[in-house]
């Protein structure tokens, strides 16, 4: 395992630095590292690492979501309430509809199989989007109109919506039936996640205040460990309560961080944010190398040009969904274009559920996995490059006004 971790960090950072020197996003180098070191090319990673890959990726995602929550200004988020809510489901719905409409023609599958494929492909990748929105908030790009906050909130919620739809469509494809409760669980999951996270954030801040009042100084490094531990518990609550009620662990983590920012002194929340930013340097490498390692490159060769055409057609229709979300707002045409670019990348959800239809024995399993792999390899770099190269041109820097 130690050798595998050495490969992940040293090769991942080296290829990331090479990509940065070539003016490409660092995550491309990390994804390539994962593909090369993974079980489908060099097979250089220990099976013990791969067996806990999903948990390690989740830890990395928790770190950047904590950083995001500690950077969010809730007053700014209130200003973009309607578009943020719509961004959580409308673009994904448009993309799923595109697959249902076009995939039978492009790929020769049934409408139901196309719905399963659309649900796999519908989610935006928080792993690609969230770190960039945090960066843009820190650099004050688009913050005057709360654009990064809106995208961050939408990207944090749309995974829940898409995964519920995927579970429903795949159950029907297996011969089951859709249940109204599955769809009711979507808003329940979001609301309970926010409530749980907010209550937990208040209790954690109260603990820090009480300790300080009794002259028990809690170092910021210890606070980071406490917040991380509580975040892991929040993610576990989602699993524990799954048979009873649906709760979003990721939203609970973001909400807890937002409340900590509100309740703690600005100096404490700033230092916590900085410390999670430093943790992200290592977590980012781990996350994207392991995402790359989960990609079976062989399936891209089987996808063919029809799958490529389908992916781009669906992305085009997805951008119409984003345009609908921001219609009627005070955003300029350039800012609306940036929102569409930010909603392109796919990685984490597709890597997690792309192989599930094949494991379930669905006849569309192989083509769904092929399209998911191709989608990751195309849209993750495309979205990352698009955001990195365009944000200074398309967004206004608040301090320059």
Go through each PLM region and give its residues:
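Hydrophobic transmembrane alpha-helices of secondary-active transporters
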Residues: 31-38, 54-80, 96, 169-174, ...
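Transmembrane alpha-helices that form the ion-translocation and gating core
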Residues: 74, 78-142, 297-395
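Structural signature of hydrophobic alpha-helical transmembrane segments
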Residues: 1-8, 49-66, 111-126, 186-199, ...
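Helix-coil boundary and interhelical linker segments in multi-pass alpha-helical membrane proteins
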Residues: 1, 42-52, 101-114, 170-184, ...
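Interfacial helix-loop-helix linkers and transmembrane-helix boundary segments
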Residues: 19-24, 44-53, 70-87, 109-113, ...
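Small-residue-rich segments of transmembrane alpha-helices in multi-pass membrane proteins
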Residues: 30-41, 86-100, 150-163, 220-236, ...
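Core mid-bundle transmembrane helix pairs that form the ion/substrate translocation pathway
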Residues: 5-17, 157, 163, 167-286, ...
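Alpha-helical transmembrane segments and their lipid-water interface positions
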Residues: 30-33, 42, 61-65, 95-103, ...
């Amino acid at each position: 395992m130690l050798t595998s971790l050495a490969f992940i960090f040293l090769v991942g950072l080296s290829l990331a630095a090479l990509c940065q020197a070539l003016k490409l996003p660092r995550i491309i180098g990390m994804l390539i590292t994962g593909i090369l070191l993974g079980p489908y090319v060099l097979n250089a990673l220990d099976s013990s690492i791969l067996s806990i890959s999903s948990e390690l990726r989740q830890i990395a995602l928790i770190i950047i979501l904590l950083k995001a929550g500690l950077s969010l200004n809730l007053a700014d988020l209130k200003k973009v309430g309607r578009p943020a809510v719509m961004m959580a489901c409308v673009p994904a719905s448009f993309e799923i509809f595109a697959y249902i409409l076009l995939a039978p023609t492009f790929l020769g599958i049934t409408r139901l199989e196309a719905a399963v494929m659309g649900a796999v492909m519908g989610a935006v990748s928080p792993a690609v989007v969230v770190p960039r929105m945090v960066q843009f908030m820190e650099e004050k790009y688009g913050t005057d109109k709360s654009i990064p906050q809106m995208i961050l909130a939408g990207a944090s919620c749309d995974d829940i919506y898409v995964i519920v739809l995927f579970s429903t469509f795949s159950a029907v494809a297996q011969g089951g039936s859709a249940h109204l409760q599955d769809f009711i669980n979507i808003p329940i999951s979001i609301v309970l996640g926010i409530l749980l996270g907010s209550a937990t954030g208040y209790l954690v801040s109260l603990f820090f205040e009480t300790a300080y009042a009794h002259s028990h100084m809690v170092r910021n490094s210890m606070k980071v460990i406490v917040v991380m531990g509580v975040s892991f518990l929040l993610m576990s609550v989602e699993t524990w309560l799954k048979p009873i009620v649906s709760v979003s662990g990721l939203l609970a983590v973001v909400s807890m961080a937002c409340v900590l920012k509100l309740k703690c002194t600005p100096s404490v929340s700033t230092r916590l944010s900085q410390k999670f930013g430093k943790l992200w340097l290592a977590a980012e490498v781990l996350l994207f190398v392991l995402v790359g390692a989960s990609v079976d490159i062989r399936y891209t060769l089987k996808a063919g040009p029809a799958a490529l055409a389908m992916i781009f057609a669906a992305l085009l229709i997805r951008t119409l969904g984003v345009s609908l979300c921001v219609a009627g707002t005070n955003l300029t045409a350039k800012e609306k274009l940036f929102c569409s670019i930010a909603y392109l990348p796919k990685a984490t959800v597709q890597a997690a559920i792309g192989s599930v239809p094949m494991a379930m024995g669905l006849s569309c399993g192989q083509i769904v996995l092929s399209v998911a792999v191709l989608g990751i390899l195309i849209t993750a770099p495309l979205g990352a490059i698009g955001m990195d190269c365009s944000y200074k041109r398309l967004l206004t820097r608040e301090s320059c006004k």
